[in-house]
Amino acid sequence: MQYLLVAAGGAMGSLTRFIIGRKISEKFTTGFPLGTFFINITGAVLLGIVSSAGLEVNRYTLIGDGFLGAYTTFSTFMYEGFNLFQDNEKLNALAYILGSLILGIIGFMFGVEIARMIKII
């Protein structure tokens, strides 16, 4: 059962990432990988909420492991950061990598606080 939940959540998460990433890339054409940045930060906030919500195992498996596991993307983050360095966009690369890490941690903590404020935990 858990494999099916991860697969279903993963399908929804990857489609959501694809659609949002595409829309952001079409709207904002910059050298900065804004789509992946937005997706990973919002994913960190959502994971903070979900991991603090006290969900029963199947719901967490569907949303946390499945949906958010596929929604966020570490491999694309690394690929884009590396390409920025190779393209001599060193300032953008540093801003992207450090900004993603710092805002990811802050976003996760913010999600935990949101869960507390709405009395999920």
Feature names for model-found ranges:
Residues M1-I121:
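Membrane-interface helix-loop junctions in multi-pass transporters/channels
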